[in-house]
Amino acid sequence: MEIIHYIVIIMTLLSSLASLLQRDLIKCIILSGFAGLCMAYLYYALLAPDVALTEAILGGAILPALFAFTVRRTQRIDE
């Protein structure tokens, strides 16, 4: 394994841990989306391009956008 793979694994772990410890929900969503993109890279490095593409679309774009929309929507109602 190349050194870049280890760096991406560490970045994935750190961003996932940071999203668990984060109190601000928008920052948590951004960090979990970043972890999804890192996972997509790792799937691509493991020669699974179909899984990588699915993870990049869902875990890196659609779900964070949906979560951000939901958080914004519920915060407006609470205020």
UniProtKB/Swiss-Prot annotation:
Cellular location(s): Cell membrane
Protein origin, superkingdom:
Archaea
Query: What is the species of this protein?
Result: Methanocaldococcus jannaschii (strain ATCC 43067 / DSM 2661 / JAL-1 / JCM 10045 / NBRC 100440) (Methanococcus jannaschii)
Could you tell me the keywords of this UniProt record? Cell membrane, Membrane, Transmembrane, Transmembrane helix
Q: What is this protein called?
A: Uncharacterized protein MJ0437
Q: Which InterPro entries match?
A: MrpA_C/MbhD
Q: Where are the transmembrane segments?
A: 28-48, 51-71
Q: Indicate how the chain sits in the lipid bilayer.
A: Multi-pass membrane protein
Task: Indicate yes or no for the key word Aminoacyl-tRNA synthetase.
Answer: no
A single Pfam family, by name?
Answer: MbhD
Instruction: Identify the GO cellular component terms for this protein.
Output: plasma membrane
